């Protein structure tokens, strides 16, 4: 009897693993079928709404455009090297100029730009939110004083922040040879302003929720302020902090696309806006490619943060959510 029960476990594991694979695949197929059927019924000023097949074709075209642009870049570099070599042959002391390639960014270049921008904005938000959240969590008076301000600023849209950020950056970030483009700085700061609140709030709540027994142990051991933070507060608050970080990263990615549309930072948001303004027959398909890419990258960012939470958090159950 026991041997029969034991023999069932491998079969049960196979069934469970099959469900993990098959159910998402079935859901994806249903989604594609519904998209295909619905797209044929929607007529726009640019034609029929693109379905999965047309969207994939536009993705293939974007891949081809990327490689064509890389070939142009390589040809430009080779011509420049030949020209400089010929110039140095005639005059070894001649000054040669190395000009960067200034071709248009491809779809994949814009993906990289968006990833760099959202990473910088998210890191800035994290650097501000976690220390401030710890301070507010440790001091109930400060938390009560600043909580109304936090609740006031938390729901402000990036479309409201961006004009203010743009004016401030234009007035303060003045340089003849800037290290970063103003559009990048505008997008970065807007992302940080909109995404820091979940991490700030969850960090403060996590700190205030530290077990009283652990706080008493810290007092008995006469730990210094920094030792108390490092050995008691942070380990206890880690699950809540990571919950805030996951929420902040999702908001950062969502906000970035809107910010790039207005700030004209050459990322995915600008790609969508340019295609919308272009209004060609291929524009709708390319916008659909961008929409799916934005969603897919957002999913990867969330899964990556979830995996990091599993590695660093002691609360494995919360890391599964």
Language-model features: where?
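C-terminal transmembrane helix and the adjacent membrane-cytosol boundary/short C-terminal tail
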Residues: 288-321
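Short cytoplasmic-facing helical segments at TM-TM junctions of multi-pass membrane proteins
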Residues: 198-244
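N-terminal signal-anchor/first transmembrane alpha helix
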Residues: 7-41
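Transmembrane-helix boundary motif in ABC transporter permease subunits
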Residues: 120-150
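Alpha-helical membrane-protein architecture signal
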Residues: 56, 100, 104, 108, ...
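Transmembrane alpha-helices
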Residues: 225-259, 289, 305
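Generic hydrophobic transmembrane alpha-helix motif, especially the helices
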Residues: 137, 147, 151-198, 205-206
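Periplasmic/extracellular loop-to-transmembrane helix junction in inner-membrane transport proteins
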Residues: 41-122
């Amino acid at each position: 009897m026991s041997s029969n029960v034991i023999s069932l476990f491998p079969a049960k594991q196979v069934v469970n693993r099959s469900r993990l694979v098959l159910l998402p695949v079935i859901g994806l197929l249903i989604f594609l079928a519904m998209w295909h059927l619905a797209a044929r019924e929607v007529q726009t000023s640019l034609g029929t709404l693109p379905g999965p097949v047309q969207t994939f074709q536009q993705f293939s075209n974007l891949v081809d455009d990327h490689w064509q642009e890389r070939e142009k870049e390589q040809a430009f570099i080779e011509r420049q090297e030949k020209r400089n070599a010929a110039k140095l042959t005639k005059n070894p002391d001649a000054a040669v100029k190395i000009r960067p390639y200034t071709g248009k960014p491809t779809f994949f270049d814009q993906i990289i730009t968006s990833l760099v921008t959202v990473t910088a904005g998210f890191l800035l938000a994290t650097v501000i939110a976690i220390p401030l959240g710890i301070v507010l969590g440790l001091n109930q008076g400060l938390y009560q004083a600043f909580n109304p301000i936090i609740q006031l600023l938390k729901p402000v849209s990036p479309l409201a922040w961006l004009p203010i950020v743009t004016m401030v950056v234009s007035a303060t970030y003045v340089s003849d040879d800037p290290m970063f483009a103003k559009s990048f700085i505008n997008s970065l700061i807007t992302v940080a302003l909109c995404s820091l609140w979940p991490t700030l709030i969850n960090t403060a709540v996590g700190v205030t929720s530290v077990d009283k027994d652990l706080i008493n142990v810290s007092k008995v051991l006469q730990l210094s302020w920094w030792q108390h933070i490092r050995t008691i507060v942070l380990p206890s608050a880690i699950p809540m902090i990571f919950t805030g970080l996951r929420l902040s990263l999702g908001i950062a990615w969502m906000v970035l696309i809107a910010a790039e549309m207005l700030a004209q930072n050459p990322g995915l948001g600008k790609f969508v806006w340019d295609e919308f303004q272009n209004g060609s027959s291929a524009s709708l398909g390319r916008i659909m490619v961008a929409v799916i890419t934005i969603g897919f990258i957002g999913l990867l960012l969330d899964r990556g943060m979830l995996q990091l939470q599993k590695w660093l958090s002691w609360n494995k159950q919360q890391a599964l959510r």
